[in-house]
């Protein structure tokens, strides 16, 4: 059993190398920038060294970085200040998606008998809990307050979302649909924590479904068509839905959530697998099979792309928008600083509280 996004990534594992002549910074391997990305600077490179990285997440409170190493069956914690691995946690199963909050990492893990969500203490490296789940886990999301984890599941005759109450340690269910061939491809929770947006697919095509979390009822459905790879919630009541297929290749569909209608589209090409918005929703980082495409969501234009020299796997953006991390299938994480002041693109960053010493914040974990 594997996650839908990782199936696509495996299919597109052959890296296309385009001839480029942009500026290169040798301090982080063979990173190159293409297009109008003068505000991006290479901050460093993390050599995780445990094989391909499937996903990456940031714990917003401490800015701790966590990555899942699918081939090594472990989760690795990275110090954001030194850009060095703190340690790895053995998970006894193949990890894929990960979300993090409050010194906890929630990891979807495939084992021989079942799929599960494992909870890891990112300070001590202990596995605190495991939630075995029926069916196949294909998507993962967390509420803004970190109190609920949403898990998309696909079975042979139905799809649903398991809801984990992280405080009460209980699991509920939101039923979505029944029928053969259906799947859940992506999940997102809105800023209020009241609505869940679900990307679903069946033999007829794909849809984005809006669910009222408190009532567990579907409120609206938007027809998309092509297979959905990811989705994100932008500004002004808009959602960005990423699709790719052989006919149109990569497309970002713009959905008006108030009318539940597609109001625009951005053609990006390639075979993209992930879309992540900056905190102010002015930029979208799209993971393609050989680069990360950067979109301006204010103008719906492609600003440029980032080539890290390896096939990128996943992107994470710090909550102030000033740092972007690109994980790849070679087991590396490239860090990029984003300029704080860009006219018409970024709001002013809120001053953060003083950071604690890194050795106090992130004590060493037991190496897996």
UniProtKB/Swiss-Prot annotation:
- Where do transmembrane segments lie in this chain? none
Q: Which InterPro entries does the UniProt record give?
A: Host-pathogen_enzymatic-act, Quino_amine_DH_bsu, WD40/YVTN_repeat-like_dom_sf
Q: Tell me where in or outside the cell this protein is found.
A: Cell septum; Cell tip
Which effects follow disruption of this gene? No visible phenotype.
User: What's the chief localization of this chain?
Assistant: other
Extract one GO cellular component term from the record.
Answer: cell septum
Quaternary data: Interacts with MmpL3 and TtfA.
PANTHER family named in the record: DIHYDRO-HEME D1 DEHYDROGENASE, PROTEIN NIRF
Function (record text): Stabilizes the MmpL3/TtfA trehalose monomycolate (TMM) transport complex under stress conditions.
Give the protein's recorded name: Seven-bladed beta-propeller protein MSMEG_5308
Q: What is the lineage of its organism?
A: Bacteria, Bacillati, Actinomycetota, Actinomycetes, Mycobacteriales
């Amino acid at each position: 059993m594997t996650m839908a996004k990782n199936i696509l990534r495996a299919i597109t594992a052959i890296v296309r190398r385009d001839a480029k002549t942009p500026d290169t910074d040798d301090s982080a391997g063979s990173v190159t920038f293409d297009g109008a990305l003068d505000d991006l600077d290479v901050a460093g490179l993390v050599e995780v060294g445990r094989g391909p990285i499937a996903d990456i997440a940031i714990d917003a409170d401490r800015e701790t970085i966590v990555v899942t190493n699918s081939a090594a069956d472990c989760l690795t914690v990275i110090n954001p200040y030194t850009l060095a691995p703190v340690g790895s946690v053995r998970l006894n199963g193949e990890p894929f998606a990960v979300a993090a909050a409050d010194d906890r990492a929630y990891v979807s893990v495939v084992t021989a008998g079942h799929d599960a969500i494992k909870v890891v203490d990112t300070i001590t490296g202990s596995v605190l809990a495991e939630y075995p789940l029926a069916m196949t886990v294909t998507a993962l999301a967390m509420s803004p307050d970190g109190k609920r984890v949403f898990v998309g599941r696909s079975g042979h005759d139905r799809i649903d979302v398991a809801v984990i109450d992280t405080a009460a340690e209980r699991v509920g269910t939101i039923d979505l649909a029944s029928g053969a061939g259906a799947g859940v491809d992506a999940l997102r929770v809105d800023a209020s924590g009241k609505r869940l947006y679900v990307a679903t697919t069946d033999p007829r095509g794909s849809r984005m479904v809006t669910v009222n979390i408190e009532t567990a009822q579907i409120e609206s459905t938007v027809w998309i068509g092509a297979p959905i790879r990811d989705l994100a919630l932008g500004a002004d009541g808009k959602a960005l839905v990423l699709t790719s297929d052989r006919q149109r290749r990569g497309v970002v569909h713009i959905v008006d959530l108030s009318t539940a209608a597609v109001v625009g589209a951005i053609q990006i090409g390639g075979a993209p697998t992930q879309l992540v918005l900056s905190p102010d929703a002015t930029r979208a980082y799209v993971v393609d099979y050989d680069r990360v495409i950067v979109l301006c969501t204010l103008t719906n234009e492609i600003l440029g792309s980032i080539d890290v020299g390896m096939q990128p796997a996943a992107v994470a953006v710090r909550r102030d928008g000033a740092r972007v991390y690109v994980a790849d299938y070679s087991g590396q994480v490239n860090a990029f600083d984003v300029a704080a002041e860009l006219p018409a693109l970024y709001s002013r960053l809120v001053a953060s509280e003083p950071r604690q010493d890194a050795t106090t914040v992130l004590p060493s974990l037991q190496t897996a």
